[in-house]
Structure formats: structure tokens, C-alpha cells
Amino acid sequence: MDQLIQLVEATQSRTDFPVINPGDTVRIQLKVIEGEKERLQAYEGVVISDRGAGASKTITVRKISHGVGVERIIPVNSPNVESVTVLKHGKARRAKLFYLRKRTGKAALKVKERKFPVKA
């Protein structure tokens, strides 16, 4: 059974996805279908969490939009994810940055920048 799961995950997993850690600021291009039209929508924010592994891996991205915090859980292997760009590598001492939810203003997105990014 484990071999079957590994085989399916190997065929379904994306290889063009960059290394993303909590604290990184990312821009994700998502496919949005409105009626018959399909367009790309950019979603930019701080990665506050990553879960799972393989085909079921997800990341939680948080941004502040018009003074309101917005979080989105994005499946890494979703066909609706067109591309992911890492804008800044953040330095975080926690695996989950849920404490950013309590902060307001600029402090809500403030994470120290990592001088030397982690290599894959």
C-alpha cells in the first residue's frame, strides 16, 4: 500500500516549486475562472505555516488588505497555482507564525530578513 501511495505522489508532485519556509514573503499567481474567462490573479503575503508533505502539502499565506488580515491556504500541487516567486527570505524561529495574527499595521507583516537563504 505504501508503494502505491509513493507512486501516486511521485507522479502528482510538482518539481518547479521553490523552497519555501515560514517567514518568507511570496507572490503566487493563481488561475481564476470567471464565467468562460480565465485570468491570473497575484496573491502576495507572508508564509505563516506549511503543512503536510508530498502531494498533500499546503502553505498558509497571510496579507493585510485594506487594514484587514486575509489568510489563504494554498495547496502546493494545485493545478490553479500557476507560479510561485519568493520575494524575501524571512528569518523565523518558529515553524508556525500564528503570533502575526495578533499584530496590526506594519508589524503584522514584519519578519527579519535572512541574509543567506537556505539552499535546497
UniProtKB/Swiss-Prot annotation:
Keywords: Ribonucleoprotein, Ribosomal protein. GO terms for cellular component: cytosolic large ribosomal subunit. One of its GO terms (molecular function) is structural constituent of ribosome. PROSITE patterns: RIBOSOMAL_L19. One of its GO terms (biological process) is translation. It comes from the Bacteria. PANTHER family: LARGE RIBOSOMAL SUBUNIT PROTEIN BL19M, RIBOSOMAL PROTEIN L19. Belongs to the bacterial ribosomal protein bL19 family. This protein is located at the 30S-50S ribosomal subunit interface and may play a role in the structure and function of the aminoacyl-tRNA binding site. This is Large ribosomal subunit protein bL19.
